[in-house]
């Protein structure tokens, strides 16, 4: 009788050990599944962040030149910034912002699609065009190889394209002006100049 009891007890212990082992295997499997899923999510997020970072670093704008129109000998009334994109991608100008500060106030300008035009005659003065007013800038297309910048609703420039961002802003002589052309993605184009003490000519190069 005692021998049978001991055998039954050993059998019960063996079954208990087997149950614990199976439970441990199941827990390990669940944990492994969670780790694999987490690793996959992290890899996906890392890839997305890497692509976004590459886009931010490689793309962007360059301000090639800034010109101004003098309404008299001591004040500018119009500014034109010639911009081109960096190598790494295209820039939608309709989502870009221009900021300018003269030291006393900072102004922000957004795109006005009604002030978009192709410049097909180099002999015409750019300042004879109807420019955007208020807190808006317009676009004059100088060079556009694929036609992407010639769409008024969302002019998009890519490598090799050149446009002039046009805006009206009164700037006095001997004034330090700084600003940026900020695209939705990528590095901003930098505007930085000081106006001269007297404007001898109507059209002046500022930067």
Curated annotation (Swiss-Prot):
Output the Gene Ontology terms for molecular function.
structural molecule activity
Disulfide feature: none
CC terms in the record's Gene Ontology section: archaeal-type flagellum
What's in the keyword line of the UniProt record?
Archaeal flagellum
Q: Matching Pfam families, A to Z?
A: Arch_flagellin
Which top-level group of life is the source organism from? Archaea
One GO BP annotation of this record: archaeal or bacterial-type flagellum-dependent cell motility
Coiled-coil zones: none
Subcellular location(s) of the protein: Archaeal flagellum
List residues traversing the bilayer. none
Instruction: Write out the propeptide range(s).
Output: 1-11
Per the similarity annotation, which family is this? Belongs to the archaeal flagellin family.
Listed PANTHER family: FLAGELLIN B1 (PTHR35903:SF1)
Q: Which NCBIfam families match?
A: arch_flag_Nterm, PRK08541.1
Q: What does this protein do?
A: Flagellin is the subunit protein which polymerizes to form the filaments of archaeal flagella.
Q: Any idea what this protein is called?
A: Flagellin B3
